[in-house]
């Protein structure tokens, strides 16, 4: 369950569905400002069921847990790719701080 995106500058990133889901830019996940993020739990097995283009600047990802309100701009996706290692570690750290163990297969 990986989405691969190639950008015009030659950069190519692979994103797990879980990573994209827990970093959804929707207000229900990202909040309405810094510090208002909502920690997403139990998304280890989430999959993308549809990718809908939004103009020439974004895609709407539809996940099998019925989350579909995030518009992922290509700029945001690029940033998620560049910062993937640090952002993933931050997510794991926040899970641990919340006392949640991520399921591994």
Where are these regions (language model features)?
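Motif-centric detector for short Cys/His coordination patterns
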Residues: 1-105
């Amino acid at each position: 369950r990986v989405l691969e995106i190639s950008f015009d500058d030659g950069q190519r990133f692979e994103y797990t569905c879980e990573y994209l889901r827990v970093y959804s830019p929707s207000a229900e996940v990202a909040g309405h400002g810094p510090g208002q993020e909502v920690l997403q739990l139990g998304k280890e097995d989430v999959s993308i069921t549809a990718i809908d283009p939004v103009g020439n600047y974004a895609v709407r990802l539809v996940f099998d847990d019925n989350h579909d309100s995030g518009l992922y701009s290509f700029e945001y996706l690029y940033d998620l790719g560049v910062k993937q290692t640090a952002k993933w570690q931050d997510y794991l750290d926040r899970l641990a701080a919340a006392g949640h163990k991520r399921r591994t297969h």
